[in-house]
């Protein structure tokens, strides 16, 4: 029997093509440096479970052009395939991982991701994919060309699993595995990661990543610390308190929050899967509120409903921009500063108002993206009980 060829992952490496527009010492620079270290670690860990790795250079579309993930990924994949085949080596299992994907995943999860059977795709999250692998059939309609054709039409990596399903591949979703959904996209996500690795039972990163998380310095000399962590933790432990959470909250995260925290929880769930439904126009009641009554009024209203607020601000950004593409939102540096309640660098008027109001609120606010309101909720709950 012929030996089964090793699977190959294409892993995004931010360091392969650094963004020249990111100034040193900025929030974005910290995020890029952290994700590069995570990509290096993930590549090494894929190798430890028997998978090959090739680096993907981040795409930088010309000004005015929208990034299309599928065309970028499949061009790189076909180039790698041509090189492998020219060397006479077989390859029938191909995968992808973002630089910050699977940062807390254990080796068993990585091994499961790297082991699709022919005609199957395995992903970390069917509805918001950050890492996946498919295995092509040696003959028939589910070959390598069919898979790449399906992925080429996919505008975002978050929709990759559903694109492969539409092409006929069976789907195996690992989203219910512990920490499968945790993905580092932002400096605030790095702060969540730093908190998570201090919790019992979580995987400890290698020395390169761990040292960075401890030594990284944000603008103003701050470390990777979540704003109001102690105050939010006190609310989570208090049966008389109420927590308000708004955004793309997965059912598993909501369930964990309900069962493992002591407080009452009020959830406003909007636009789950908006990044994988790139062609749909996002809509949000909270965004409508900011447009009709102003961002500061939204902060005031949310604060009146509970003793702490956790807000997925990207839903508001997407709805106000009429697009789930981050290139249409306020610039990355402004988004990242807002997450740390720093309104000073925020030039977008509505976001500056929202950020300043949240920072000045008597009720503690946490602002962020999808990681904050998904696996980030579990991190916050577990940390609260440990008094971290």
Language-model regions, residue ranges each:
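Conserved donor-nucleotide/metal-binding helix-loop-beta segment in metal-dependent transferases, i.e.
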Residues: 101-128
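Short, glycine-/small-residue-rich phosphate/pyrophosphate-handling segment
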Residues: 118-122, 137-167
């Amino acid at each position: 029997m012929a030996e089964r060829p090793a699977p190959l992952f294409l892993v995004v490496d931010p360091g392969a093509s650094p963004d020249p527009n990111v100034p040193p010492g900025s929030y974005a620079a910290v995020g890029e440096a952290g994700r590069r270290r995570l990509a290096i670690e993930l590549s090494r860990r894929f190798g430890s479970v028997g998978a090959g790795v090739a680096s993907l250079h981040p795409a930088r579309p010309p000004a005015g052009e929208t990034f299309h993930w599928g065309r970028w990924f499949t061009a790189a994949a076909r180039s790698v395939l041509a090189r492998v085949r020219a060397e006479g080596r077989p390859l029938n299992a191909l995968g992808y991982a973002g630089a910050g994907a699977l940062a807390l995943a254990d080796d068993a999860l990585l091994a499961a991701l790297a082991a699709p059977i022919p005609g199957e795709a395995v992903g970390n999250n069917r509805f918001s994919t950050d890492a996946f692998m498919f295995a092509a059939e040696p003959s028939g309609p589910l070959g390598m060309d069919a898979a790449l054709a399906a992925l080429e039409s996919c505008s975002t990596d978050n929709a990759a699993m559903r694109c492969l399903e539409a092409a006929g591949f069976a789907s195996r979703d690992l989203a219910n595995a512990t920490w499968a959904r945790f993905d580092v996209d932002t400096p605030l996500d790095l702060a969540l990661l730093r908190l998570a690795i201090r919790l019992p039972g979580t995987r400890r990163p290698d020395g390169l990543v761990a040292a960075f998380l401890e030594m990284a310095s944000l603008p103003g000399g701050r470390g990777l610390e979540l704003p109001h962590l102690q105050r939010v933790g006190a609310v989570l432990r208090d049966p008389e308190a109420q927590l308000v959470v708004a955004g793309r909250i997965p059912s598993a995260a909501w369930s964990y929050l309900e069962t493992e925290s002591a407080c009452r929880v009020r959830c406003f769930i909007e636009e789950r899967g908006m990044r994988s439904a790139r062609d749909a126009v996002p809509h949000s009641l909270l965004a409508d509120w900011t447009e009709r009554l102003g961002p500061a009024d939204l902060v005031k209203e949310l604060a009146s409903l509970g003793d702490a607020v956790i807000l997925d601000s990207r839903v508001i950004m997407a709805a106000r921009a009429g697009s789930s593409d981050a290139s249409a939102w306020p610039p990355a540096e402004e988004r990242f500063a807002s997450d740390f309640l720093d309104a000073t660098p925020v030039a977008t008027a509505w976001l500056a108002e929202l950020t300043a109001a949240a920072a000045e609120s008597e009720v503690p606010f946490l602002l962020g993206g999808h990681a904050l309101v998904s696996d980030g909720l579990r991190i916050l709950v577990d940390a609260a009980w440990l008094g971290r």
